[in-house]
């Protein structure tokens, strides 16, 4: 585990890694990342469910054929296998990403 799970520490690691995301924590099926795409979000559907918690910035979230605006502090969910991406986002966009559960996602409650 990293020293502290903070946005500041995650951004420092992103700068060093020169990547759009960095994994900061893993436990069981839980994986915590910080994600900072540049200009275009190129992610593809994932095998597991994921939750985003927007740290900064705003834009549009495309998820399973639907679009919705997003902003700081917002929580977004993308089920396993769903086509999703961030669109028209501001230059300061950063989000926490929480992957969890089994491949294929969890069954709806």
Model-based region annotation:
Residues 29, 48, 92-93:
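A structure-centric signal for secondary-structure junctions around beta-strands
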Residues 46-61:
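Short, conserved beta-strand element in jelly-roll/cupin
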Residues 65-80:
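Short acidic-glycine-tyrosine-enriched beta hairpin
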Residues 1-34, 39-44:
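A short, N-terminal "cap"/entry segment at the start of jelly-roll beta-barrel domains
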Residues 22-24, 40-46, 63, 87-88, ...:
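Short histidine-centered beta-strand/loop micro-motifs
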Residues 28-30, 37-40, 58-60, 101-105:
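Short, charged/polar surface micro-motifs in flexible loops or helix N-caps
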Residues 32-34, 61-63, 95:
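Short hydrophobic/aromatic-rich beta-strand segments that constitute the beta-sheet cores
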Residues 80-106:
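Ligand-binding loop in jelly-roll beta-barrel domains
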């Amino acid at each position: 585990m990293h020293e502290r799970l903070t946005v500041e520490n995650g951004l420092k690691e992103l700068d060093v890694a020169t990547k759009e995301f960095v994994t900061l924590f893993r436990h069981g099926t839980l994986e915590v990342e910080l994600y900072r795409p540049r200009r275009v979000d190129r992610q593809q559907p994932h095998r597991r469910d994921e939750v985003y918690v927007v740290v900064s910035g705003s834009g549009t979230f495309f998820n399973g054929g639907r679009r919705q605006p997003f902003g700081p502090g917002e929580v977004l969910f993308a089920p396993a296998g769903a086509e999703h991406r961030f669109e028209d986002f501001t230059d300061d966009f950063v989000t926490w990403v929480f992957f969890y559960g089994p491949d294929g996602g969890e069954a709806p409650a």
